[in-house]
C-alpha cells in the first residue's frame, strides 16, 4: 500500500511499505523543502532517515504497557496503532495518509480537534469496558518507554508521564531540571509533578 507523508496540507513524499511493515521505500519526493529535518541531515541516505522518522511515531515495544495498549486498541502492532490516527504527533505537524485519501490537516490535527481522555493508557483509570478502540488519539504515536499521554487542560496541551521501576524517579528528575533551568533563566519546558 502507498502512503503520503504530509506536512500540514503540503504533500511531502509518497512511500510504500514492504516486508510486512519492516521497511518503507520512497516512491517520489514531491516537496523537498518540507522533508523532516533528519532527512535533511542525511541527504545521501534519505530512505533510512524516513524509516527512522516513521519508527519514532510508534509506541516502542519496551514500554511497560505495550501489550495492554495493543489489546485495548485491538491492534496487531505499533504501526497499526499509529496509522489509525494518521501518525499525527503533537510534537510536529507531520502526518501520514493513504494516497487516495481526501483527509486534510484540519480533520486530523489535535491542536484544533479534541484529544480523547486516554488516562487508561497510563493506568490512571480502569474503564476498559467503556473504551472505544477505534477512536483517533495522538497517544498511539507517542514514542518513549515511559507510560505517557497527551491531554487538553483548558487552552493548553500537556504531556503526562508516569514513572517506572521502584522509585518512579523520571518525572521527579524532569521537574527538578525544569526548576534548575528556570533559576538560570534559560529556555526550557516546564515540568511539574502531579498525582493521577
Language-model-derived ranges and their functions:
Residues 1-135:
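Regulatory N- and C-terminal appendages and interdomain linkers associated
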Residues 107-196:
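Conserved ATP-binding subdomain of kinase catalytic cores across diverse folds
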Amino acid at each position: 500500500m502507498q502512503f503520503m507523508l504530509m506536512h500540514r496540507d503540503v504533500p511531502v513524499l509518497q512511500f510504500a511499505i514492504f516486508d510486512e511493515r519492516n521497511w518503507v521505500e520512497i516512491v517520489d519526493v514531491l516537496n523537498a523543502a518540507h522533508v523532516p529535518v533528519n532527512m535533511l541531515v542525511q541527504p545521501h541516505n534519505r530512505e533510512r532517515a524516513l524509516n527512522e522518522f516513521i519508527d519514532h511515531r510508534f509506541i516502542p515495544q519496551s514500554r511497560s504497557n505495550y501489550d495492554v495498549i495493543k489489546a485495548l486498541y485491538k491492534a496487531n502492532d505499533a504501526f497499526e496503532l499509529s496509522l489509525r490516527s494518521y501518525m499525527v504527533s503533537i510534537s510536529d505537524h507531520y502526518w501520514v495518509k493513504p494516497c487516495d485519501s481526501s483527509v486534510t490537516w484540519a480533520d486530523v490535527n489535535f491542536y484544533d480537534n479534541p484529544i480523547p481522555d486516554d488516562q487508561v493508557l497510563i493506568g490512571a483509570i480502569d474503564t476498559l469496558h467503556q473504551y472505544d478502540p477505534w477512536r483517533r488519539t495522538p497517544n498511539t504515536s507517542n514514542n518513549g518507554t515511559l507510560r505517557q499521554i497527551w491531554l487538553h487542560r483548558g487552552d493548553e496541551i500537556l504531556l503526562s508521564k508516569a514513572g517506572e521501576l521502584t522509585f518512579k524517579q523520571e518525572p521527579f528528575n524532569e521537574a527538578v531540571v525544569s526548576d534548575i533551568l528556570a533559576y538560570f533563566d534559560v529556555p526550557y519546558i516546564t515540568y511539574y509533578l502531579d498525582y493521577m
